[in-house]
Amino acid sequence: MRAAFIILIGGLSCLAISCAKDSPQPASIPGQLTDIPEGFDEIKYPSGNEFNMARWMLGKRLFFDPILSADGNVSCGSCHKPHLAFSDDVAFSPGANGAPGTRNAPSLANVAYHPYFTREGGVPTLEMQILVPIQEHNEFNTNIVELAEILSKDQSYIEMSQAAYERNPDPYVITRAIANFERTLISGNSAFDQYYYLGNKMALSSVQKIGLDLFFGKANCSSCHGGFNFTQYAFENNGLYESFDDPGRFRLNRDSADLSRFKVPSLRNVALTAPYMHDGSLLSLTDVVEHYNEGGKNHPNKSSQIKPLHLSEGEVIALVSFLEGLTDYSFITNKLLQP
């Protein structure tokens, strides 16, 4: 059960879809995979898992291969769809054999910059996070050791693994290859980026510019969603409910101050990632803005930042329009990142 495993390394969904059985040869590195957007930090690859095309190609194949799941039908890409900025459009993504999920699948865009993983931050590295969906009963419901044995019977996977890490498929290879691929899911070419970082003053509409001023000003969204990735990675209770079914970070550390506090998500590509919140309970961006405009519901751990905003109807529209301007269409149409 997820709650039991979270104490060890946490939870989050991975992704999937089937790939060709042929073993492709590593090619030269396309610029789209390594270029860092203006205003972004450099990506830090861990020692022993630095980027190269052999690792990336293996990771991509594994990411979209449903062989990772017990029933052979669910992959990382099943819950993290490229055209949705590697998120899903349902409240809870089904796992192997249709097992119901318990949390909304977050976007994986810019996951390379996250300092910890899962909604309660219980996993310190991207490589470790890969283990979570593999063994969760309501996700892949399998075992990484058994999975490695299955992959070791596939000659094409053996060849790709040797090219990438000079060893046959094993838990080390599986976790590192998928993480290597996921670190290239970089999104930083939205209308906002063109306006703010590249100086194209026509990139945002007049309404979106009003929304931008609200975001960083009156609405103070940037207090939680600041920085180039539109998150400070803090843990907050946003007053979604007076009583939450999900204990949030509390189930990791048993600290009552963390009851129903969750990691603040990035807002990049947020127009594509509905439904919203940890449980997918809000269906539209307007619903989200109205929730914060009303100041949320009473909860003893509600963030002090959550208070009535007193936005007019026109200001709500402008703020939503600005959030739509965070969509990176080049990211979601990049064929290199698709199956």
PLM region descriptions:
Residues 19-339:
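Periplasmic c-type cytochrome electron-transfer domains
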